[in-house]
Amino acid sequence: MAAGSITSLPALPEDGGGAFPPGHFKDPKRLYCKNGGFFLRIHPDGRVDGVREKSDPHVKLQLQAEERGVVSIKGVCANRYLAMKEDGRLLASKCVTEECFFFERLESNNYNTYRSRKYSSWYVALKRTGQYKLGSKTGPGQKAILFLPMSAKS
């Protein structure tokens, strides 16, 4: 490029596509927990835990933006929403309630955290055993609260 020349960038495609394929952010995800290497799993009976097998159909999750920085997490196969109860338990609800909204934050280590909007100092977390961790036992800096969203396509 010669000094003083102006470069123009190509226009975005009409379909709004760009660096990411269409629907990229709406594709189902698996949430991989740094603590123990588990994927967050939502069962059809309402239980929530972690499993190491990424092929388990109940680890396929749909993260839906509800407002800026706030998501709901739905188990695709279970057709239930992740919820945090007032005692800190994680379970899966048939319908969306205030307990189903989580602040999604990208941390400096490139993992995401999911903090309850209703119980604002509690996080979604998995123990090293794959069991969920009570919200009241969670806090910033714990490995149990760190999740890596991975594609669940295929």
From Swiss-Prot:
InterPro entries the record matches: Fibroblast_GF_fam (IPR002209), IL1/FGF (IPR008996)
Q: Where is this region: Disordered?
A: 1-20
Question: Any keyword Iron-sulfur?
Answer: no
Propeptide at which positions? Answer: 1-9
Task: Provide the binding site for heparin.
Answer: 35
Question: Tissue specificity, please?
Answer: Found in all tissues examined.
Question: Where along the sequence does the record put site: Important for interaction with integrin?
Answer: 127-128, 133
In terms of one coarse class, where is the protein primarily found?
Answer: secreted
User: Residue positions of the PTM Phosphotyrosine?
Assistant: 81
Listed GO CC annotations: cytoplasm; extracellular space; nucleus
GO aspect biological process, one term: fibroblast growth factor receptor signaling pathway
Recall the GO molecular function terms of this protein's record: chemoattractant activity; chemokine binding; cytokine activity; fibroblast growth factor receptor binding; growth factor activity; heparin binding; histone H3K9me2/3 reader activity; identical protein binding
Describe its PTM?
Answer: Phosphorylation at Tyr-81 regulates FGF2 unconventional secretion.
**Which SUPFAM superfamilies does this one have?**
Cytokine (SSF50353)
For this UniProt record, the keywords arranged alphabetically read as follows: Angiogenesis, Developmental protein, Differentiation, Growth factor, Heparin-binding, Isopeptide bond, Mitogen, Nucleus, Phosphoprotein, Secreted, Ubl conjugation
- Where in the cell is the protein located? Secreted; Nucleus
Which residues constitute the cross-link Glycyl lysine isopeptide (Lys-Gly) (interchain with G-Cter in SUMO1)? 94
Q: Which domain of life is it from?
A: Eukaryota
Main function: Acts as a ligand for FGFR1, FGFR2, FGFR3 and FGFR4. Also acts as an integrin ligand which is required for FGF2 signaling. Binds to integrin ITGAV:ITGB3. Plays an important role in the regulation of cell survival, cell division, cell differentiation and cell migration. Functions as a potent mitogen in vitro. Can induce angiogenesis. Mediates phosphorylation of ERK1/2 and thereby promotes retinal lens fiber differentiation.
Please state which protein family the record places this protein in.
Answer: Belongs to the heparin-binding growth factors family.
Its name, as the record gives it, is Fibroblast growth factor 2
Organism per entry: Rattus norvegicus
